[in-house]
Each structure stands twice: as C-alpha cells, then as structure tokens.
C-alpha cells in the first residue's frame, strides 16, 4: 500500500480501496503490492507459508471485490516469456478496469531456477534479458491504438484492425512476432514498477519504471536511492518526477512499544533463537541461544562493534543498550531489511513525517504485523495525525 507526493503515471485517477474493513481505507492507499518467490521455502516447516499462490491470480480475485485500489503483482523477467506476461497483466488490467501494475524483477535464487529446469544466469545476462522482456512486453501492450476498440454493435464492427499494429521484435534473449488480442484498459496499459538495486536495477528503473519498491534501512540510504532513481530517469530521457520511490515500512501499532513487543513475542518467539547468530555477527559478538532471554552484559556492550557493512547494526546496538533481552532486541525488527517502527500511532506518524520531510521517499509501502488489526488502526488513528500535520 502507498501514499505518495504525486500519483504514479497511469494511476492518475487513484484507485485506492479499503484494506481490511470495508470502507475503512477508501482513497487512502494507492495500491496493494504482492511479492513472489517461485520456490519451496524450508521455513514453511515452522513458519506460516507466504508467497505460495501466483500473485496475478490472487490479485485477479481481489479485483472482483474492489473498485479503486491499484493491484501490483511481482513477476520474474528471468523465468517467463514476454508474450505470457504481457497477456496476463493486460488481462488483469482489463478485468480491474485499469488498476494493474507489474513489479518486474530478475530472479537469482537457485531453488527457483531449478523449478524451471535452469541454472542461475550471471547478473549481466539476467538484466540483459530483463531489458528485452520489458521492451517486448511494453510493445505488446502498446500495439493497440486508443481508438482501435470500436465496440460498435449497430454496425457489427468491434475492432479497427488497421489500428492494431503487430509486434516484430527479436533480441538476444527473447522475441515476439504478432498481436496481443486484448484492448487497452481505462488506464491504457499496466504501470511498471522496479525493485532491483545497484546500477543494473537503476537502469531498469530509469528506462521503464513509474515506481520503485525501495529497500532502505536509513533515511540517508533511502534518500540516496531516490536521487539515484531520479537521475537514472533523466539519463534515459525522462523527467525525474516520472519515477516515484516508495520506502518500505514494517510497522507495529499499539498502545506503546511494550504492547507491540508482547504481540510479536506471541507470534514469532519460537523462531527467534535461530536468528541469534545473525544478530551476533552484526554486533561482532558470539551469542548463544541459551542466553536469548538475557540482555547483553556491560562488557559485551562495550565490546560490541556494529558491522560497517550493515546499516542495521547501529540500530541493533542502540536497542540492545536500552536494556532489552536478546529476544526482545530481535522482535524490535533489527535484522529486518526495512525500518520497523513500533509503538503508538503518534510514534508511527513521527517516523513517516521524518522520512518524508527529509526527502527520503515519495511515499511508503507498508507491511504491518497483523493486517486485520494494524491496517484499521493505521487508517483510523495514524492517517488522521498525518492529515492534521498537513502531510
């Protein structure tokens, strides 16, 4: 879900729907975003399964029950063919009356590659294929002229075929020759998002994306990523404002931080001991699972050295110095890849305001602890605070 400084291109008529309770979030969220992982995860043995259903199919079901909210699905450019992706997303766009978006990503996971009977390609090859995929998919989407779809029952003419141009593209990795037999939706074609980092990902975002699904833990990192995406758009001959950067936020809303921590402990406590070595690596300490319900000793706090290669490490040490047990440090979300503010609605609003006013993002995508509860609280209690502050 997201709010933004300006609506994304193609989402110029924001289709924002109610997230949890019918009507509670109408016109408050620009889109719902589904990630994807096309492989079996060993974590399913002890944790709730996630990302097991095809996101396009899932969002098609959601489209039937909603009217305004945008529907953004993740699909890989590595293990799909352009015609299939163009057809699937154009169908979702038509079914939803112009609310579809494609988060175009490359895939480097060996388990996912094995499912498709392939090996993991080198990064330049993966992104070379991604560029070709996006060019072909967008060409297929754009093959219909806006006035090609006649729908004239009286004359019996439904399509002006002279205004449907065939695609004839041949690249090093993919190709397509022919027509996509699906007319434009109300928004024309699906919106393209990007979630890749580094120079390869920036090039994709600059040339093709209207939105970037960001992954930054600090304001400084987010601001740098946002500026890099804007510069990439300009280098591709586009306006910098054509690309919107959405910072991720894994929030927990409650009466206070203790209330949220208790809830997280109830849901996730069994999985935390296995993550203790990772926390130790971030702090330069050897941490054993039998000490998970103890805080760091004064000597350990003095010896701790946050990893200079991990921006989350400083936050982890900051939380540990507050006297929390190691289990509680972990449920603060210090090893998550996005900021994890917890506490009262005012605390969450403060975080959003600080990032937004610092120029770290154009909007946010939110992943709450408990969707049924936190989305309603966010809409009913956090958003009014932001409105009062003129945000």
Which residues does each PLM region occupy?
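Active-site mouth loops of central-metabolism enzymes
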Residues: 2-15, 74-83, 119, 186-199, ...
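Hydrophobic faces of well-ordered beta-strands that scaffold small-molecule active sites
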Residues: 32-34, 69-75, 98-104, 190-195, ...
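N-terminal beta1-alpha1-beta2 module of alpha/beta enzyme domains
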Residues: 1-65, 187-190, 300, 304
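An alpha-helical appendage that flanks or caps ligand/catalytic pockets
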Residues: 124-187, 220-223, 231-356, 387-391
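Acidic (Asp/Glu)-rich catalytic clusters
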Residues: 25-26, 59-67, 93-99, 234-240, ...
